[in-house]
Amino acid sequence: MEDEIELKTAPADFRFPTTNQTRHCFTRYIEFHRCTTAKGEDANECERFAKYYRALCPGEWVDKWNEQRETGTFPGPL
């Protein structure tokens, strides 16, 4: 017998109406990296932000942003 799989995504955020998911994605990515900077790479509190940005952002964007962070050219405030 197969186990049931429960799918979840980022909860609604009043700061972002449904028409602005690009900004929501970018903000969640920044929140995750700010959290890990403040609390450490293994902080459990930061995992929710990781789940949110991974659910909202296209993989190509995340790859590009990770690359930009490594080279110091990321356009956002971290």
UniProtKB/Swiss-Prot annotation:
Record's keyword annotation contains Methyltransferase: no
Any one of the GO CC terms: mitochondrion
Statement: the UniProt record of this protein carries the keyword Disulfide bond: yes
Position of sequence motif Cx10C motif: 46-57
Chain ranges for the short sequence motif Cx9C motif as given in the UniProt record: 25-35
Pfam families given in the database record: COX6B (PF02297)
Keyword annotations from UniProtKB, A to Z: Disulfide bond, Mitochondrion
Domain CHCH intervals: 22-65
Similarity section: Belongs to the cytochrome c oxidase subunit 6B (TC 3.D.4.8) family.
PANTHER family on file: CYTOCHROME C OXIDASE SUBUNIT 12, MITOCHONDRIAL, CYTOCHROME C OXIDASE SUBUNIT 6B
Protein name, per record: Cytochrome c oxidase subunit 6b-3
UniProt source species: Arabidopsis thaliana (Mouse-ear cress)
Taxonomy of the source species: Eukaryota, Viridiplantae, Streptophyta, Embryophyta, Tracheophyta
